[in-house]
Amino acid sequence: MVAIAEPQAAVAVTDGSVEATLDYYLETGEKPYTYTGGPGSLDVRTGGGKDPRQVLLHSGRQEAGDFTLDRNGFRFVRHDTKVGDFFDEAQIRSVYYPEMEALVKAQSGASRVVVFDHTLRTADDAAREARKIREVVRRVHNDYTEWSGPQRLRDILPGEAEALLQRRFAIVQV
């Protein structure tokens, strides 16, 4: 099956909750894939089974202080950035990277933080085409697996990776 992903409109319910359709992967025997024509391209195709499900999403903002990295794998943190334009690659690297390094170190207690990349995405077709930005991902997914997480560490820090893999490490997305 090949389909162009269409955005699903969310419907407000109450107290910051919304009903939305989330597309999950459905096992069909076909290997799932996503093809994009690259940054700025409007050509996006996906394959593999699609299992759309209507779900109720609750805002976590009211309980923001209850979430912890150790228990939930995420937490809500307020951060005021000095970045004025998130489409400016130079600002992101020179201002936001150091901000995120300090933020993750302070929030996680990590002894070392390495900011290794970022991805700009937008659902606005005109902005995506004009600024050569990638499209949003329209499937429920995880970015790293048991195999790809350690492999990413090897790719980023090849000379240190094997020693670092003997200790605890985390890939934190901000």
Label for each model-derived stretch:
Residues 4-173:
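Non-heme Fe(II) oxygenase catalytic core, chiefly the N-lobe of the double-stranded beta-helix
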